[in-house]
């Protein structure tokens, strides 16, 4: 207590006459020069330096009119070098140190491990062109088809895009898909060839593919190497000259679009926003058009490349905000929502939102230990805040306990989510094989979409009440060298595909379009395609409606009792193959018991595959004399009766690890 009083007395004195202390003993007052006074810690000095840098940055941004803003993104096929090119642009504008080569905008651990972009990330850059400062907003988008929703949301914040093509691989399936998405949004496209320094690069072939596939003027295409930085300095002047400035007026009422959101333990929900009109500052009260809820803004800022606070965000800017008190419920942050200031709700037209992506692949997720369900629930809720395309429903299984039915856009989307649960949240989980939704059309006209095999109608109900069963189809676009054409067609036909078109867009490259059941696509079709073409094929797909199909529910029975967690909806042609796989694999992981265990795969009442696990058998004849036939027969009959009673009342004990091993690939 005495020490605290001494410190308070010391703080209350004027800086020039504070005592020079040693430990807690106070000496006589001495005159201290202000020039040699030091801050309490080095942290204070660092924060002061940071605030000076932020104010310098703000001052430059404040002097730039909206006519010198440019919002653009980079779109391409997966692994064509988008994130590496983003790094070079950030180096060029001084946002990061040269040579860091860290893929700064890939912020998730799973992105760095897999070398793919999963979440669209934004960064603000300042660039001086012809003696004038320009404010550039770069958005690095994913390339994989499963993250198409991320790409389309990014386009809403952009005026143009760099269409990036690998000079060694040329135009590929997702290049085509991303081009049409950007074209439909009316974006100005700048063709860019990457990896021109590779020995295998063929720029002329790639440019010809871009001309023939997209009808783009490639005379002014920029040939770069994101890895070495070759010609990267030509990109930003081209962006400034060709991509239009955003339209908006900072003097109008605030109109702000919610583009993305993520969760912070300390700040609550953080929102990534694009300001279309007006301006927003800390302390403003805003209202959501979607929910009607009102919030006070706690902080606004830009990504530079990390969160950098600013005093204001103006029309045309892309930045982040969070509220104080924070938005704590993830459901309040609706992607595509419009915000305005309180009092202007009737004067402002809400912006058109985004089309909600539909989940097309479903899995069940259970904690490895039933006691960890709450931890799994918290982890899932935090991750879906950052990815709204995932649907979540609670469900329960007799075998595996409480869990979730999760819906995803595709199998890679599911795999990435599983990795994030394990690595970022330490969750230990069981994931069932992916299934796709099916439609049940009843005779009375009612239509039901079934995403959980447990809700699929049984055989009797189908015969009595159901008019038709339908499964989803996709239009798959495959590109590959023509030498593999026969193998790819064979693979597509084996997966119940319907051929639509076959085109050569170069003398050796083929674009093949097939209509395929989505259920076949999620069963490692891409892996088989890569195997058939030695890794040279690329795949993109889009929804193609629903078709009538002969689909059934395949169940696993253990001693004639169904194991609910392992049921699947499949086409009838797959029943026998899958059934044999199931019973053989499940037998490997179930321990022997004191009674016989019968493992069956069945469709309705029809058993399609069976395996038997023999019981332990005690040698009851070990102590008998060889000639004692009647006693021998009596003991064997007694053992046989005991086994019958066990079979009637015995419950099969299946260890949790058996399900874990069975569900693992």
From Swiss-Prot:
All residue ranges annotated as the tr-type G domain in the record: 67-247
Catalytic activity: GTP + H2O = GDP + phosphate + H(+)
Compartments, record wording: Mitochondrion inner membrane
Residues that coordinate or bind GTP: 76-83, 140-144, 194-197
Keyword Cell cycle tagged: no
EC number(s) given by UniProt: 3.6.5.-
One Gene Ontology MF term: mitochondrial ribosome binding
Domain of life, per lineage: Eukaryota
Membrane-protein topology: Peripheral membrane protein
Recorded GO CC terms: mitochondrial inner membrane; mitochondrial matrix
Keywords: GTP-binding, Hydrolase, Membrane, Mitochondrion, Mitochondrion inner membrane, Nucleotide-binding, Protein biosynthesis, Transit peptide
Interval spanned by the transit peptide: 1-53
GO biological process, one term: translation
PANTHER family: TRANSLATION FACTOR GUF1, MITOCHONDRIAL (PTHR43512:SF7), TRANSLATION FACTOR GUF1-RELATED (PTHR43512)
Family: Belongs to the TRAFAC class translation factor GTPase superfamily. Classic translation factor GTPase family. LepA subfamily.
Role this protein plays: Promotes mitochondrial protein synthesis. May act as a fidelity factor of the translation reaction, by catalyzing a one-codon backward translocation of tRNAs on improperly translocated ribosomes. Binds to mitochondrial ribosomes in a GTP-dependent manner.
Descriptive protein name: Translation factor guf1, mitochondrial
Gene: guf1
